[in-house]
């Protein structure tokens, strides 16, 4: 029998959270996802794992024992992109949090992870987040939350998401999301200058075909050319646009097989784009999962 922590995944999407927990050394033993496109992705990558399709009809007794429940309930009613139309937890989609909480109450896993858009924190003037935190607290969980951004975890994107970790009967949740001061303070003199790293990186990069998309490009200087687009050392770099000409790597996987004109883009595979848009930043999830493992050994073993 495996000694790995077991994970039950809800609102699984295409399995980004599941992958992050597997990368950290845990075992996913259950998934629940309603969209058929995402179900097909899950079946391809986790063919042996039980997959339920509708959380609203899911009975707690049908979920195998799991140490960790993970899931990001639908964000449409919470997202700032729907400003003026946000129904919050009263909405039919984001209101599925209550069903998730019901399953947590009945099965009482040691750990709970909730991922959602930052809009969860201020929806209904903060009342929706208060409901989420209070609900978990009343179920006996210690609750911690933090907004994390994918750009600080080695990915070339700004993807800010709110993460809520809850630990049953212990204060372990806070230790998962927040580092002790000693772990977060570094000796600046020990760091290599970024321009040195940039020079040394060239030989390690793989060969690839490229073509021109912008003349100025991204220079190694803090500012370069009339657009002033140099590399930044305080966050994600500037985005190349389509004016002029410079270098872009040709990759079938990165471009979904074809580079198109704006007229064609509207006819692309919307299911794939929607699934990617709803996905999580896996390195962030893996970081959280690894810290759950450490805290679990401390508080539950």
Regions found by a protein language model. Name each.
Residues 1-3, 300-301:
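Basic/polar N-terminal segments that are highly enriched at the extreme N-terminus
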Residues 9-12, 67-68, 91, 115, ...:
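Short glycine- and Lys/Arg-enriched binding-loop motifs that mark or flank ligand-binding interfaces
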Residues 52-54, 118, 140-152:
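Conserved S-adenosyl-L-methionine
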Residues 125-149, 167-170:
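Charged, glycine-enriched surface loops/patches
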Residues 145-152, 157-301:
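Class I SAM-dependent DNA methyltransferase catalytic core
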């Amino acid at each position: 029998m495996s000694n790995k922590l077991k994970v039950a995944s809800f609102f699984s999407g295409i399995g980004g959270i599941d992958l992050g927990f597997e990368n950290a050394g845990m075992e996913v033993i259950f998934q629940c996802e309603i969209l058929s496109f995402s179900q097909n992705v899950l079946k391809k990558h986790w063919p042996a794992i039980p997959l339920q399709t509708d959380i609203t009809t899911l009975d707690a007794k049908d979920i195998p024992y799991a140490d960790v429940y993970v899931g990001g309930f639908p964000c449409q009613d919470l997202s700032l992109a729907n400003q003026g139309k946000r129904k919050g937890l009263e909405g039919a989609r984001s209101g599925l949090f209550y069903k998730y909480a019901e399953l947590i109450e009945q099965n009482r896993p040691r750990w709970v992870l909730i991922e959602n858009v930052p809009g969860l924190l201020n929806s209904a003037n903060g009342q929706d987040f208060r409901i989420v935190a209070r609900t978990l607290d009343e179920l006996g969980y210690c609750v911690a939350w933090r907004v994390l951004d994918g750009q600080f975890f080695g990915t070339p994107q700004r993807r800010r998401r709110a993460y809520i970790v809850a630990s049953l009967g212990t204060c372990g949740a806070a230790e998962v999301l927040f580092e002790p001061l000693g772990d977060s303070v570094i000796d600046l003199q020990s760091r290599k200058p970024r321009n040195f790293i940039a020079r040394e990186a060239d030989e390690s990069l793989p060969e690839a075909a490229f073509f021109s998309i912008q003349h100025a490009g991204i220079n190694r200087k803090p500012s370069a050319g009339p657009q002033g687009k140099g590399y930044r050392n305080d966050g994600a770099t500037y985005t190349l646009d389509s004016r002029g000409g410079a270098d872009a790597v040709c990759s079938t996987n990165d471009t979904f097989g074809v580079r198109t004109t704006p007229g064609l883009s509207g006819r692309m595979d919307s299911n794939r784009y929607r699934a990617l848009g709803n996905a999580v930043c896996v390195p962030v999830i893996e970081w959280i999962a690894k810290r759950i493992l450490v805290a679990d050994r401390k508080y539950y073993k």
